[in-house]
A protein has these predicted regions:
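Short amphipathic alpha-helices in soluble, non-transmembrane regions
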Residues: 292-302
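Glycine-rich phosphate/pyrophosphate-binding loop regions near the starts of catalytic domains
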Residues: 14, 22-177, 183, 188, ...
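Active-site-proximal betaalpha loop/short-helix elements
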Residues: 20, 107-109, 201-277
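Acidic, Ser/Thr/Pro-rich beta/coil linker or hinge segments at domain junctions
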Residues: 300-359
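Short, ordered loop/turn segments at secondary-structure junctions
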Residues: 18, 65, 105, 137-139, ...
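N-terminal amphipathic/basic leader segments beginning at the initiator methionine
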Residues: 1-31, 330-332, 347-355
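Helix N-cap motif at beta-to-alpha junctions
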Residues: 285-290
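Short Gly/Ser/Thr- and Asp/Glu-enriched loop/turn motifs at secondary-structure junctions
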Residues: 43-45, 275-280
């Protein structure tokens, strides 16, 4: 009799499984990995790293699909988002984004002006970092089959800084945050029909490679790096803790949150740590280099608020890094949040679905 691989507790896939938090991890761990895990080159990372022929360099590749609602938002649109999101996933592996593919799934009836505006936005972002389009595809589906427009991308880039991995955290590492958190998620909340919030808040949607390029060319020990998209900062830190069997301690006062983001969070009862970002990354770095790395990030407009927000206080010496392990079952794998009065609480792995169709 064939062994049953899955312990997935649902008979149908819940919306929360697309959140980038615990439910997403559960779906991947219980449905995908039992069947596909042995084929993955780079399990648990936003991009896989591979060698190509006789090239002296490795390459990073990432695929992503963008389904945001609304498709136009303060600070960008689905076109800009698709390039920035895919480019950033490759950059998080220490690579320079160089090539991209694009797949468009268009709902019948989408306005010509709307589509052209999105394509112009894509062209602007592609030109910004000199990306080359390798291939593209277009499908038009009957009205009601999808919501306006979905975009799939695959980005490829040459690795300039090797060894970056969520499994590579070391005891004593300093955790750096490149920018204020929550702007993308809060701005999408504010723009959704029915919520009725009026705000000047803009999404932080941006390509991060230009800010990170000096770090890739220098002699810096970057152990882990991740852009804080779905699930926000909380998801990134908990994924790192899980993968490296580490305890991470974060100083709440060091995390910069814009007042408008705080306002949206207070009105809706949200934690800014769990809101999506599209122009923010976290780094785990050699402690002696942390201050210099922060200064380099601050020299770029996207990193002007970069700061050290915490450190890795413990790493299990016997950990076997695998995203197939359950964070909740490992007491050493945790993220601790300290407030200004010295009290501590866990920064929980995001549960449920805060906001569907966020990116």
């Amino acid at each position: 009799m064939q062994k049953k691989h899955t312990q997935y507790p649902h008979t149908t896939i819940p919306l929360a499984a697309g959140s980038g938090g615990a439910a997403s991890d559960e779906l991947i761990r219980e449905i995908f990995l039992p069947h596909l895990g042995r084929f993955f080159v780079s399990e648990g990372e936003d991009a896989g790293v591979f060698s190509a022929g006789d090239s002296a360099k490795d390459f990073a590749i990432s695929t992503d699909s963008f389904v945001i609602s609304p498709i136009f938002f303060n600070g960008g649109d689905i076109g800009k988002l698709s390039i920035c999101g895919s480019s950033n996933d490759v950059a998080m592996m220490g690579a320079k984004p160089e090539f991209i593919t694009l797949g468009f799934m268009i709902e019948e009836g989408l306005g010509q002006d709307e589509l052209e505006k999105i394509i112009k936005s894509i062209a602007c972002e592609v030109e910004r970092t000199d990306l080359k389009i390798l291939s593209a595809d277009t499908k038009v589906l009957p009205k009601g089959s999808i919501d306006k427009l979905f975009i799939n991308t695959t980005c490829i880039g040459k690795v300039l800084k090797s060894g970056i991995s969520s499994k590579a955290l070391q005891k004593g590492d300093k955790i750096i945050l490149s920018a204020p958190i929550g702007a993308h998620g809060a701005s999408i909340f504010a723009s959704r029909e029915g919520i009725g919030l009026h705000s000047n808040l803009q999404s932080d949607c941006a390509q991060l490679y230009e800010m990170l390029e000096p770090l890739f060319g220098g002699d810096f020990e970057i152990h882990a790096m991740r852009d804080a998209t779905r699930g926000g900062l909380s998801a990134v830190l908990n994924e790192w803790a899980n993968a490296s069997k580490a305890q991470i301690e974060i100083d709440e006062e060091c995390i910069y949150i814009d007042e408008e983001v705080r306002g949206v969070c207070e009105i809706l009862g949200l934690e800014a740590y769990m809101l999506a970002n599209e122009g923010v990354c976290a780094l785990s770095v050699e402690p002696s280099q942390a201050s210099e790395i922060c200064e380099i990030l601050r020299s770029h407009p996207l990193g002007r608020y970069a700061s050290i927000i915490g450190e890795v206080t413990e790493v299990s010496s016997t950990h076997k890094a695998s995203s197939n392990q359950n964070l909740a079952k490992d007491t050493k794998a945790r993220v601790v949040l300290k407030n200004k009065w010295g009290s501590k609480r866990f920064m929980e792995y995001p549960q449920g679905e805060l906001l569907p169709r966020i990116c």
